[in-house]
Amino acid sequence: MRRVTYSPSYTLVPTYECFNRCTYCNFRAEPGTDRWLSLEQAEFRLRSLPSGSVIEALVLSGEVHPKSHRRTAWFRRIYDLCDLALRLGFLPHTNAGPLSYEELAQLKRVNASMGLMLEQVTPALMQTVHRHAPSKQPEVRLQQLEWAGELRIPFTTGLLLGIGETAADWVDTLTAIARLHRRYGHIQEVILQPHSPGSSQTEIGEPFAPERLTETVAIARQILPADIALQIPPNLVSPQTLLDCLAAGATDLGGISPIDEVNPDYAHPQADALAAQIRPGGWRLVPRLPVYPQYDDWLYSAIRERVQGFREWISETGQLEPESGEHDADR
Ligand SMILES: O=c1nc2n(C[C@H](O)[C@H](O)[C@H](O)CO)c3cc(O)ccc3cc-2c(=O)[nH]1
Ligand SMILES: C[C@H]1O[C@@H](n2cnc3c(N)ncnc32)[C@H](O)[C@@H]1O
Ligand code: SF4
């Protein structure tokens, strides 16, 4: 049976507050109105997870303006949350919007991989869905991908589909990702994320037409180098569309967490249910780490050792539970 991967994950949200206002967002809170996640709360939540059930700590955040006086404290909290997750035996993956070169370099110390969606490179969206979202400027996001390449950070990016772009725009965005990967070799996966309206977005947009996703997968597979994984979020598509996307070249189902914080109206299926859902297509669902194996030697040694421990565990047991049942790497 052919393999399809997913990452057993748990999402930590340092803050929902965000200075951008993407019209499709169901995540953001107004700056100043949201309490930040404390390290104590985060530790409690991570320690409450059934042992051996989760590998990735996805640190997903709203953004504080780069020039705000609160930026340093915000960044510090993100760094500390990653450091905590690592100490508790998880592998962090951070997506906190565009970061400065120095911030990226710092977070590399405490992350197995990082990510930022390119969304779409057409500047036209800065007049529509992104008109109040300066951090969605294509140049800013392209710059971030370039810096991640220079810093040798295994990186996840992707396209948000159905936000007013054309099919020609998909080609431009995918071509930009392919070009960056040919230069730096750091793009581990590309997410094809269908815009999915939720109950708290500021403008109700149309959902991305599911029939078109298969077409997008085929185009992405043609444009992207073969070593880049293609990720489809299984909670945002129908079971049939998911099978069609796998047949068209999708290889991964992303992080599966108790709650999809970005799209809280769409429950993540449990891994068992997902495995059963794709089995009729001849697909076997297997867990993966947030960093793909070809990047292990880019990691700082403390993270690399942790990663290699997880790899041995998955290959020995073929499943997730560690033999000791212990998930605390401190000891
Ligand atoms: O549960 C989710 N995980 C999301 N993830 C998590 C992602 O699936 C995994 O963290 C990576 O595949 C690494 O394992 C993102 C990660 C990124 O770097 C960029 C965007 C996303 C978007 C989502 C999302 O909408 N929902
Ligand atoms: C973290 C990523 O989640 C995506 N994102 C934000 N809002 C939505 C939505 N309503 N539907 C689907 N994806 C969304 C964006 O692509 C962002 O970069
Ligand atoms: S999608 Fe990200 S950048 Fe846009 S408003 Fe939501 S949290 Fe902020």
Stretches found by the model and what they are:
Residues 4-12, 55-59, 92-94, 114-116, ...:
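Hydrophobic faces of well-ordered beta-strands that scaffold small-molecule active sites
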Residues 31-182:
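Conserved Radical SAM active-site core
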Residues 21, 123-126, 198-201:
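Short acidic/His/Gly/Ser-rich catalytic and metal-binding motifs that mark active-site loops
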Residues 171-331:
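Auxiliary Fe-S-binding modules of radical SAM enzymes
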Residues 1-5, 299:
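Acidic/polar, glycine-rich intrinsically disordered N-terminal extensions of enzymes
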Residues 10-12, 63-65, 96-100, 120-122, ...:
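Active-site-proximal loop/turn and secondary-structure-junction residues that shape catalytic pockets
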Residues 4-41:
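Canonical Radical SAM [4Fe-4S] cluster-binding loop centered on the CxxxCxxC motif
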